[in-house]
Amino acid sequence: MNERQTGGEGEIVLRKVFEGDLPIFFEQQQDKAANYLAAFIYRDPYDRQAFNNHWHKIFVNPTVVNRTILYNGQVAGYLGKFEIEGQPEITYWLGKNYWGKGIATGALTEFMKELEERPIYARAAKDNFGSIRVLQKCGFQITGYDRGFANARGQEIEEAILQLG
């Protein structure tokens, strides 16, 4: 399960998410600019108990697949596959310090090799050009748009719906 790939000047490794990764994920999700771009975040990203409860539900859900992204041995973020109404969907988060190095693209490329389900979907705020570009580099295509309430922005916004396969 430890998939390896290079990203920029470093090594990308995917591994199982450990409980010890959660404080790093929580810290990464405190960045206001990152939350704005992600848009569809927890109601209160600063509520550690809500964050821990959310991850506990993830850990016990057999349909969820999670991987921690390591970059040069450091926890850079995570990837996940979950289901909404029986449809597989992926999500990912990368700490801001790791943006712009090809890490998200490299990690998602490896993750998609592990997941055999197709079609598989992803969503991103329509103005999150970086995330949409990562998804497109990994073969996802925009199939439409939807609107949803973005907690990070306090309003309804448009989101791109992407599909692979």
Predicted regions and their residues:
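Short loop/turn motifs at secondary-structure junctions and domain boundaries
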Residues: K57-T63
